[in-house]
Amino acid sequence: MLFRSPTAIDLRLILSVIKVSANLERIGDYSKNMAKRTSVLLQMREIDNAASSLRRLAKEVELMLKDALDAYIQRDPERALEVINKDKDVDQMYNGMFRQFLTFMMEDPRNITACMHLHFIAKNIERMGDHVTNLAEIVYYLVKGEIIEHVRPKGDRTSFTVVRPEDSD
């Protein structure tokens, strides 16, 4: 590149490498945080179905990451779009888990500590999915030279969740 003028694709490639590495670093940060929380959870009693729900969520994000990296290597914008579309599924799974953890905490206060750690692990996995979606958007931009013009809605509906304890009357 030093012996010629850089083209648009050259500049997009440089930009994509920088952005991809930043997103992968954040995914690594979330993984580290999850490992710390897991060591605490090992000392607590197991919450019904929580482990299998987390595994399903993590598997979905893992497959998205594989597809996003494959799209990057193969410069495949269609595969990148498929990854972007899967983000909604991850958000829905996370929102369901959030409600599930709230239910477990309300049913038995002894579940609160474990459910909070599980919630943060699920949130970390959901955020990993968001970073994987960023990777897919970067791939699309790299190949097509176009920024995807959709505004990604925040799939996390937990900010609007209201829990009302049952009346004691």
Could you describe each region identified by the protein language model?
Residues 1-169:
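Cytosolic, long alpha-helical scaffolding segments
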